[in-house]
Amino acid sequence: MSTASAASSSSSSSAGEMIEAPSQVLNFEEIDYKEIEVEEVVGRGAFGVVCKAKWRAKDVAIKQIESESERKAFIVELRQLSRVNHPNIVKLYGACLNPVCLVMEYAEGGSLYNVLHGAEPLPYYTAAHAMSWCLQCSQGVAYLHSMQPKALIHRDLKPPNLLLVAGGTVLKICDFGTACDIQTHMTNNKGSAAWMAPEVFEGSNYSEKCDVFSWGIILWEVITRRKPFDEIGGPAFRIMWAVHNGTRPPLIKNLPKPIESLMTRCWSKDPSQRPSMEEIVKIMTHLMRYFPGADEPLQYPCQYSDEGQSNSATSTGSFMDIASTNTSNKSDTNMEQVPATNDTIKRLESKLLKNQAKQQSESGRLSLGASRGSSVESLPPTSEGKRMSADMSEIEARIAATTAYSKPKRGHRKTASFGNILDVPEIVISGNGQPRRRSIQDLTVTGTEPGQVSSRSSSPSVRMITTSGPTSEKPTRSHPWTPDDSTDTNGSDNSIPMAYLTLDHQLQPLAPCPNSKESMAVFEQHCKMAQEYMKVQTEIALLLQRKQELVAELDQDEKDQQNTSRLVQEHKKLLDENKSLSTYYQQCKKQLEVIRSQQQKRQGTS
């Protein structure tokens, strides 16, 4: 065995040769397995089992092969890791020869996949975190692509192969076991199909641009917090067939154009149309200026506290900051159109938002709890979306201008009333006859302005009017008023029916002068008008409530129709796919028959 030959053409060397004399071929430290104290199994890699262990008083990850069939992947990863040295690539400490295993840097944060889609509780993360992860991934891959004398292609980029350290702020690429055995490993790997470039599974010649395609899918995934092509389901070949036919993840609502353009370029069917990883690094580095806070550690729901609400908004992404330092004057019931001043994680489940809206703090911050909403505009209505997808709705404006959008919004006329982010506010007539914007769920009819609350009146709600209206409590007097009815023994005014005391202060009938017939007539007319006014307001409130019920029913009907239409389209699509596959099968069958006949002819002539 020639060491020089093995070093110059390591890819052609046998696995046995390289294991027998790795110190002569590869640049790594040989570690005595007795120095390692294995603690627990933490997962699987491209080959073998990954365990957490202690080595020389520090945490390490050891990757052991389980069978001889994994030995080649082990050699590939050992060879590739011994070549690289980059802050965004997992570090190789050394290898053991008996038993065969790699000793690598331990990532306490686990994989990016588990952070995005793992078991509850899931951490909150901001758009800054999402962009930073993608930037670091691109930096690591760009380093691999720039290696000399021959570029190294990862070929299996996906969140399970991206590890997080330093509180989730630093990303490291791992699993190089597929770097030279793409056909035997990846085409049979269901877990990689969603991120795989079409030219890889099509059997075409591929270059480092296949990593660019995978990176574009990862960018979509960290922004939406959804699994790519999850709605397709079935075996891996269904995803491959869809990607082959041009299917890509749905575009993201409110995603800034520079990010969308970069992402869709990475998805291009033609590898030559995709940007290089070096170009991606330049673009992402430029865009990161608009995403501060990426160095803040990830926060989990159990770490959340009300006391730290105002300080954790920008670092944890646990709520949308409506009244932040730059937009303290912004407050509108239609919050869909209010750009947030920090990069938070937006949870869009409307029912949860409605419950949260009732628990607003007086500081003006709207706390959004974790939900399972999706930021993808064109996803099926019945799909179970992932949690806390990155809110990109206001980044485009910040990219276009370095100063944040600060146009004043119309505020509420009632303090501590915020409306609902996803609901269109209703115009409700207040007691003084002026329109007032309220959220749909808040069906209060009127209310005095702050500072106008009197000892006799308060802001009544529909419920108060319904249960204490003029027809059920004290109706307007129809008989002539007499001085005997004007006051009780304590001198309090009993001339005004109690129902009218729920009216706004300036609308309540005033006690008449008992010695003036004109005053008495005005008072009685005022009482009748007040009664009619209350009836109309009550009817308006009830009609509004009924309207909301009808709107809800209509929405449900539309959802049912959409579901039916979606199922019909999906059925048609499956039929077309079945027909296409059948045609393809027949073509392959004919080709096979032709090949067999040609072989038979050759055998006959020979």
Curated annotation (Swiss-Prot):
It is found in: Cytoplasm; Cell membrane. Residues 36-291 form the Protein kinase domain. The gene is MAP3K7. Changing K158R: Abolishes ubiquitination. Activated by pro-inflammatory cytokines and in response to physical and chemical stresses, including osmotic stress, oxidative stress, arsenic and ultraviolet light irradiation. Activated by 'Lys-63'-linked polyubiquitination and by autophosphorylation. Association with TAB1/MAP3K7IP1 and TAB2/MAP3K7IP2 promotes activation through autophosphorylation, whereas PPM1B/PP2CB, PP2A and PPP6C dephosphorylation leads to inactivation. Ceramides are also able to activate MAP3K7/TAK1. Isoform 1A is the most abundant in ovary, skeletal muscle, spleen and blood mononuclear cells. Isoform 1B is highly expressed in brain, kidney and small intestine. Isoform 1C is the major form in prostate. Isoform 1D is the less abundant form. There is a cross-link at K72, K158, K209 (Glycyl lysine isopeptide (Lys-Gly) (interchain with G-Cter in ubiquitin)). Residues 361-375, 453-463 have a biased composition (Low complexity). It is linked to Frontometaphyseal dysplasia 2: A form of frontometaphyseal dysplasia, a progressive sclerosing skeletal dysplasia affecting the long bones and skull. Characteristic features include supraorbital hyperostosis, cranial hyperostosis, undermodeling of the small bones, flared metaphyses, and digital anomalies. Extra-skeletal manifestations include hearing loss, cardiac malformations, and stenosis, particularly of the upper airway and urinary tract. FMD2 inheritance is autosomal dominant. Cardiospondylocarpofacial syndrome: A syndrome characterized by growth retardation, dysmorphic facial features, brachydactyly with carpal-tarsal fusion and extensive posterior cervical vertebral synostosis, cardiac septal defects with valve dysplasia, and deafness with inner ear malformations. CSCF transmission pattern is consistent with autosomal dominant inheritance. Residues 1-300 are annotated as: Interaction with MAPK8IP1. Belongs to the protein kinase superfamily. STE Ser/Thr protein kinase family. MAP kinase kinase kinase subfamily. It comes from the Eukaryota. InterPro entries: Kinase-like_dom_sf (IPR011009), MAP3K7 (IPR049637), Prot_kinase_dom (IPR000719), Protein_kinase_ATP_BS (IPR017441), Ser-Thr/Tyr_kinase_cat_dom (IPR001245), Ser/Thr_kinase_AS (IPR008271). This is Mitogen-activated protein kinase kinase kinase 7. Residues 306-338, 443-452, 464-473 have a biased composition (Polar residues). Its cofactor is Mg(2+). CDD domains: STKc_TAK1. GO terms for cellular component: ATAC complex; cytoplasm; cytosol; endoplasmic reticulum membrane; endosome membrane; nucleus; plasma membrane. The modification Phosphoserine is found at S192, S367, S389, S439, S455. Residues 301-338, 354-391, 443-493 are annotated as: Disordered. The modification Phosphothreonine is found at T184, T187. It catalyses: L-seryl-[protein] + ATP = O-phospho-L-seryl-[protein] + ADP + H(+); L-threonyl-[protein] + ATP = O-phospho-L-threonyl-[protein] + ADP + H(+). Gene3D superfamilies: Phosphorylase Kinase, domain 1, Transferase(Phosphotransferase) domain 1. Can form homodimer. Binds both upstream activators and downstream substrates in multimolecular complexes. Interacts with TAB1/MAP3K7IP1, TAB2/MAP3K7IP2 and TAB3/MAP3K7IP3. Identified in the TRIKA2 complex composed of MAP3K7/TAK1, TAB1/MAP3K7IP1 and TAB2/MAP3K7IP2. Interacts with PPM1L and PPM1B/PP2CB. Interaction with PP2A and PPP6C leads to its repressed activity. Interacts with TRAF6 and TAB1/MAP3K7IP1; during IL-1 signaling. Interacts with TAOK1 and TAOK2; interaction with TAOK2 interferes with MAP3K7 interaction with IKKA, thus preventing NF-kappa-B activation. (Microbial infection) Interacts with herpes simplex virus 2 protein US2; this interaction induces MAP3K7 phosphorylation and subsequent activation.
